Amino acid sequence: ENPAFKNYSLKDFTVDVLDQLKAVDIEEYLEYLKVYDTTDVHTKETKQVTNSERGLFRKMSALRSFYNYFFKRQIIQKNPTLFVDMPKLHDKAIIRLDTDEVAKLLDYVESCGSKLTGQALSYYNKTKERDIAIITLLLGTGIRVSELVGLDLSDVDFNNNGVMVTRKGGSQMVVYFGEEVEKALRNYLETYRKAVTPLAGYENALFLSTQRRRIGVQAVENMVKKYASQITNKRITPHKLRSTYGTALYKETGDIYLVADVLGHKDVNTTKKHYAAIDEDRRRSAANVVKLREP
Protein backbone atom coordinates (compact mmCIF):
# COMPACT_ATOMS: atom_id res chain seq x y z
CA GLU A 1 0.00 0.00 0.00
CA ASN A 2 1.14 3.52 -0.75
CA PRO A 3 1.49 5.26 2.65
CA ALA A 4 0.51 8.62 1.11
CA PHE A 5 -2.98 7.26 0.44
CA LYS A 6 -3.30 4.84 3.36
CA ASN A 7 -6.28 6.61 4.93
CA TYR A 8 -8.03 7.39 1.64
CA SER A 9 -11.43 5.93 0.87
CA LEU A 10 -12.53 5.45 -2.74
CA LYS A 11 -14.49 8.73 -2.77
CA ASP A 12 -11.39 10.66 -1.68
CA PHE A 13 -9.56 9.92 -4.93
CA THR A 14 -9.80 12.61 -7.61
CA VAL A 15 -8.15 13.04 -11.01
CA ASP A 16 -5.55 15.29 -9.36
CA VAL A 17 -4.14 12.24 -7.59
CA LEU A 18 -2.96 10.87 -10.94
CA ASP A 19 -0.51 13.76 -11.27
CA GLN A 20 0.96 12.98 -7.85
CA LEU A 21 2.04 9.45 -8.74
CA LYS A 22 5.51 8.72 -10.08
CA ALA A 23 6.93 5.86 -12.12
CA VAL A 24 8.33 4.27 -8.96
CA ASP A 25 4.80 4.13 -7.52
CA ILE A 26 3.61 2.21 -10.58
CA GLU A 27 6.57 -0.18 -10.31
CA GLU A 28 5.83 -0.81 -6.62
CA TYR A 29 2.17 -1.42 -7.50
CA LEU A 30 3.14 -4.06 -10.07
CA GLU A 31 5.38 -5.74 -7.51
CA TYR A 32 2.52 -5.71 -5.00
CA LEU A 33 0.18 -7.32 -7.52
CA LYS A 34 2.37 -10.42 -7.85
CA VAL A 35 1.18 -11.72 -4.46
CA TYR A 36 -1.14 -9.91 -2.07
CA ASP A 37 -3.81 -10.55 0.56
CA THR A 38 -7.41 -9.46 0.16
CA THR A 39 -10.44 -9.65 2.45
CA ASP A 40 -13.84 -10.81 1.26
CA VAL A 41 -16.38 -8.06 2.04
CA HIS A 42 -19.09 -10.63 2.81
CA THR A 43 -17.30 -13.44 4.69
CA LYS A 44 -14.48 -11.26 6.07
CA GLU A 45 -12.11 -14.08 5.20
CA THR A 46 -8.60 -13.22 4.03
CA LYS A 47 -7.18 -15.00 1.02
CA GLN A 48 -3.99 -14.73 -0.99
CA VAL A 49 -4.19 -13.55 -4.60
CA THR A 50 -1.49 -14.09 -7.21
CA ASN A 51 -1.12 -12.73 -10.73
CA SER A 52 0.60 -14.50 -13.60
CA GLU A 53 2.73 -12.73 -16.20
CA ARG A 54 -0.35 -12.30 -18.36
CA GLY A 55 -2.37 -11.04 -15.41
CA LEU A 56 0.25 -8.37 -14.67
CA PHE A 57 0.42 -7.48 -18.37
CA ARG A 58 -3.35 -6.99 -18.57
CA LYS A 59 -3.44 -4.80 -15.46
CA MET A 60 -0.56 -2.65 -16.68
CA SER A 61 -2.26 -2.27 -20.07
CA ALA A 62 -5.44 -1.15 -18.35
CA LEU A 63 -3.51 1.35 -16.22
CA ARG A 64 -1.76 2.78 -19.29
CA SER A 65 -5.07 3.16 -21.11
CA PHE A 66 -6.55 4.84 -18.04
CA TYR A 67 -3.69 7.37 -17.88
CA ASN A 68 -3.65 7.92 -21.65
CA TYR A 69 -7.32 8.87 -21.64
CA PHE A 70 -6.77 11.80 -19.23
CA PHE A 71 -3.33 12.72 -20.59
CA LYS A 72 -4.48 13.06 -24.23
CA ARG A 73 -7.34 15.27 -23.12
CA GLN A 74 -4.89 17.44 -21.11
CA ILE A 75 -6.80 16.77 -17.90
CA ILE A 76 -3.53 15.65 -16.28
CA GLN A 77 0.01 16.88 -16.95
CA LYS A 78 1.99 13.67 -16.35
CA ASN A 79 1.83 10.06 -17.50
CA PRO A 80 4.22 8.00 -15.34
CA THR A 81 3.09 4.73 -16.95
CA LEU A 82 5.14 5.65 -20.05
CA PHE A 83 8.32 5.30 -17.99
CA VAL A 84 7.48 1.83 -16.68
CA ASP A 85 8.33 -1.22 -18.78
CA MET A 86 5.49 -3.58 -19.59
CA PRO A 87 5.75 -6.92 -17.76
CA LYS A 88 7.54 -9.51 -19.88
CA LEU A 89 5.54 -12.35 -21.37
CA HIS A 90 7.34 -15.65 -21.82
CA ASP A 91 5.92 -18.08 -24.35
CA LYS A 92 4.31 -21.13 -22.83
CA ALA A 93 5.37 -24.55 -24.03
CA ILE A 94 2.75 -26.09 -26.30
CA ILE A 95 0.95 -28.94 -24.58
CA ARG A 96 -0.03 -31.62 -27.07
CA LEU A 97 -0.35 -35.35 -27.42
CA ASP A 98 2.53 -37.36 -28.80
CA THR A 99 1.84 -39.75 -31.68
CA ASP A 100 1.61 -42.78 -29.39
CA GLU A 101 -0.70 -40.87 -27.05
CA VAL A 102 -3.08 -40.07 -29.91
CA ALA A 103 -3.34 -43.78 -30.67
CA LYS A 104 -3.82 -44.60 -26.98
CA LEU A 105 -6.59 -42.01 -26.64
CA LEU A 106 -8.53 -43.28 -29.64
CA ASP A 107 -8.06 -46.91 -28.56
CA TYR A 108 -9.24 -46.06 -25.06
CA VAL A 109 -12.39 -44.28 -26.24
CA GLU A 110 -13.20 -47.26 -28.47
CA SER A 111 -12.64 -49.96 -25.85
CA CYS A 112 -12.94 -48.57 -22.32
CA GLY A 113 -16.43 -50.01 -21.96
CA SER A 114 -14.87 -53.29 -20.85
CA LYS A 115 -13.70 -51.53 -17.68
CA LEU A 116 -17.07 -49.98 -16.83
CA THR A 117 -20.16 -51.30 -15.07
CA GLY A 118 -23.69 -50.22 -14.26
CA GLN A 119 -24.77 -46.68 -15.07
CA ALA A 120 -21.32 -45.66 -16.32
CA LEU A 121 -21.34 -48.52 -18.84
CA SER A 122 -24.87 -47.68 -19.95
CA TYR A 123 -23.92 -44.02 -20.54
CA TYR A 124 -20.75 -45.02 -22.40
CA ASN A 125 -22.60 -47.39 -24.71
CA LYS A 126 -25.11 -44.66 -25.47
CA THR A 127 -22.56 -41.98 -26.32
CA LYS A 128 -19.61 -44.06 -27.57
CA GLU A 129 -20.02 -43.41 -31.31
CA ARG A 130 -20.66 -39.71 -30.73
CA ASP A 131 -17.60 -39.33 -28.51
CA ILE A 132 -15.38 -41.19 -30.97
CA ALA A 133 -16.63 -38.98 -33.81
CA ILE A 134 -16.00 -35.76 -31.87
CA ILE A 135 -12.49 -36.67 -30.71
CA THR A 136 -11.52 -38.06 -34.12
CA LEU A 137 -12.82 -34.92 -35.85
CA LEU A 138 -10.91 -32.64 -33.48
CA LEU A 139 -7.69 -34.64 -33.89
CA GLY A 140 -8.13 -35.06 -37.64
CA THR A 141 -8.93 -31.47 -38.61
CA GLY A 142 -7.71 -29.15 -35.86
CA ILE A 143 -10.99 -27.21 -35.81
CA ARG A 144 -11.88 -25.20 -32.72
CA VAL A 145 -14.38 -26.63 -30.24
CA SER A 146 -16.65 -23.63 -30.90
CA GLU A 147 -16.56 -24.50 -34.61
CA LEU A 148 -17.33 -28.15 -33.89
CA VAL A 149 -20.41 -27.54 -31.75
CA GLY A 150 -21.74 -25.12 -34.37
CA LEU A 151 -21.73 -27.73 -37.14
CA ASP A 152 -25.00 -28.69 -38.80
CA LEU A 153 -25.78 -31.90 -40.68
CA SER A 154 -25.71 -29.95 -43.93
CA ASP A 155 -22.14 -28.79 -43.22
CA VAL A 156 -20.78 -32.32 -43.75
CA ASP A 157 -19.89 -33.17 -47.35
CA PHE A 158 -18.89 -36.81 -47.81
CA ASN A 159 -18.48 -36.35 -51.57
CA ASN A 160 -15.45 -34.15 -50.94
CA ASN A 161 -14.74 -35.25 -47.35
CA GLY A 162 -15.01 -31.78 -45.89
CA VAL A 163 -16.91 -29.80 -43.26
CA MET A 164 -17.99 -26.18 -43.62
CA VAL A 165 -16.90 -24.38 -40.45
CA THR A 166 -17.67 -20.84 -39.35
CA ARG A 167 -14.42 -19.24 -38.25
CA LYS A 168 -13.82 -16.43 -35.79
CA GLY A 169 -15.30 -13.26 -37.24
CA GLY A 170 -17.99 -15.15 -39.11
CA SER A 171 -16.06 -16.19 -42.23
CA GLN A 172 -16.72 -19.68 -43.54
CA MET A 173 -14.22 -22.24 -44.78
CA VAL A 174 -14.22 -25.88 -45.86
CA VAL A 175 -11.89 -28.02 -43.76
CA TYR A 176 -11.08 -31.38 -45.30
CA PHE A 177 -10.76 -34.68 -43.42
CA GLY A 178 -9.29 -38.11 -44.05
CA GLU A 179 -10.63 -41.66 -44.05
CA GLU A 180 -10.48 -42.14 -40.27
CA VAL A 181 -12.62 -39.07 -39.67
CA GLU A 182 -15.01 -40.10 -42.43
CA LYS A 183 -15.47 -43.54 -40.87
CA ALA A 184 -16.07 -42.10 -37.39
CA LEU A 185 -18.61 -39.57 -38.69
CA ARG A 186 -20.50 -42.15 -40.75
CA ASN A 187 -20.68 -44.54 -37.78
CA TYR A 188 -22.02 -41.75 -35.58
CA LEU A 189 -24.66 -40.70 -38.10
CA GLU A 190 -25.83 -44.30 -38.54
CA THR A 191 -26.06 -45.00 -34.79
CA TYR A 192 -26.41 -42.30 -32.12
CA ARG A 193 -27.56 -39.48 -34.41
CA LYS A 194 -30.14 -41.64 -36.18
CA ALA A 195 -31.49 -43.07 -32.91
CA VAL A 196 -32.00 -39.70 -31.20
CA THR A 197 -34.93 -37.43 -32.01
CA PRO A 198 -33.73 -33.84 -31.48
CA LEU A 199 -35.81 -31.34 -29.57
CA ALA A 200 -37.52 -28.63 -31.60
CA GLY A 201 -34.98 -26.15 -32.92
CA TYR A 202 -32.07 -28.60 -32.89
CA GLU A 203 -33.06 -30.79 -35.85
CA ASN A 204 -30.08 -29.64 -37.94
CA ALA A 205 -27.40 -29.90 -35.24
CA LEU A 206 -24.69 -32.43 -36.12
CA PHE A 207 -23.70 -33.31 -32.56
CA LEU A 208 -26.42 -33.76 -29.95
CA SER A 209 -26.21 -33.98 -26.17
CA THR A 210 -27.98 -36.64 -24.14
CA GLN A 211 -30.67 -33.99 -23.58
CA ARG A 212 -31.26 -34.03 -27.37
CA ARG A 213 -30.02 -30.47 -27.80
CA ARG A 214 -26.99 -29.17 -29.71
CA ILE A 215 -23.99 -30.22 -27.66
CA GLY A 216 -22.22 -27.34 -25.89
CA VAL A 217 -18.58 -26.32 -25.59
CA GLN A 218 -18.36 -27.24 -21.91
CA ALA A 219 -19.81 -30.70 -22.53
CA VAL A 220 -17.14 -31.39 -25.17
CA GLU A 221 -14.41 -30.03 -22.88
CA ASN A 222 -15.55 -32.28 -20.04
CA MET A 223 -15.76 -35.28 -22.34
CA VAL A 224 -12.23 -34.78 -23.73
CA LYS A 225 -10.85 -34.29 -20.22
CA LYS A 226 -12.61 -37.45 -18.99
CA TYR A 227 -11.04 -39.69 -21.61
CA ALA A 228 -7.62 -38.02 -21.88
CA SER A 229 -7.03 -38.13 -18.11
CA GLN A 230 -6.99 -41.92 -18.35
CA ILE A 231 -4.07 -42.08 -20.77
CA THR A 232 -1.83 -39.12 -19.83
CA ASN A 233 -1.04 -36.74 -16.98
CA LYS A 234 -1.08 -33.79 -19.40
CA ARG A 235 -4.03 -31.42 -19.05
CA ILE A 236 -5.66 -32.12 -22.39
CA THR A 237 -8.47 -29.91 -23.69
CA PRO A 238 -10.06 -29.63 -27.14
CA HIS A 239 -7.61 -26.80 -27.84
CA LYS A 240 -4.71 -29.14 -27.03
CA LEU A 241 -6.10 -31.58 -29.60
CA ARG A 242 -6.03 -28.67 -32.06
CA SER A 243 -2.36 -28.09 -31.16
CA THR A 244 -1.71 -31.80 -31.64
CA TYR A 245 -3.12 -31.64 -35.16
CA GLY A 246 -1.20 -28.46 -36.01
CA THR A 247 2.05 -30.00 -34.80
CA ALA A 248 1.52 -33.21 -36.77
CA LEU A 249 0.64 -31.28 -39.94
CA TYR A 250 3.68 -29.04 -39.64
CA LYS A 251 6.02 -31.97 -39.01
CA GLU A 252 4.66 -33.76 -42.07
CA THR A 253 4.67 -30.80 -44.47
CA GLY A 254 7.05 -28.19 -43.06
CA ASP A 255 4.66 -25.64 -44.59
CA ILE A 256 3.82 -23.02 -41.97
CA TYR A 257 1.51 -21.19 -44.39
CA LEU A 258 -0.53 -24.34 -44.98
CA VAL A 259 -0.82 -24.91 -41.23
CA ALA A 260 -1.91 -21.30 -40.69
CA ASP A 261 -4.53 -21.61 -43.43
CA VAL A 262 -5.98 -24.91 -42.21
CA LEU A 263 -6.10 -23.74 -38.58
CA GLY A 264 -7.75 -20.48 -39.60
CA HIS A 265 -5.00 -18.18 -38.30
CA LYS A 266 -5.37 -14.77 -39.96
CA ASP A 267 -1.76 -13.90 -39.16
CA VAL A 268 0.91 -16.49 -40.02
CA ASN A 269 3.09 -15.00 -37.26
CA THR A 270 0.64 -16.45 -34.76
CA THR A 271 1.33 -19.89 -36.21
CA LYS A 272 5.08 -19.30 -36.33
CA LYS A 273 5.11 -18.33 -32.67
CA HIS A 274 3.29 -21.49 -31.64
CA TYR A 275 5.43 -23.87 -33.68
CA ALA A 276 8.84 -22.19 -33.34
CA ALA A 277 10.05 -25.04 -31.12
CA ILE A 278 9.46 -27.52 -33.93
CA ASP A 279 11.54 -25.33 -36.25
CA GLU A 280 14.35 -25.56 -33.71
CA ASP A 281 14.13 -29.38 -33.79
CA ARG A 282 14.22 -29.35 -37.61
CA ARG A 283 17.28 -27.10 -37.64
CA ARG A 284 19.01 -29.32 -35.09
CA SER A 285 18.33 -32.46 -37.13
CA ALA A 286 19.65 -30.70 -40.24
CA ALA A 287 23.09 -30.56 -38.64
CA ASN A 288 23.61 -34.25 -39.36
CA VAL A 289 22.16 -34.31 -42.87
CA VAL A 290 25.22 -32.99 -44.70
CA LYS A 291 28.27 -35.26 -44.38
CA LEU A 292 31.68 -33.69 -44.84
CA ARG A 293 33.47 -37.04 -45.19
CA GLU A 294 32.29 -40.50 -46.00
CA PRO A 295 32.50 -42.72 -42.91
PLM regions: where:
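Conserved catalytic core of the tyrosine transesterase superfamily
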Residues: 1-295
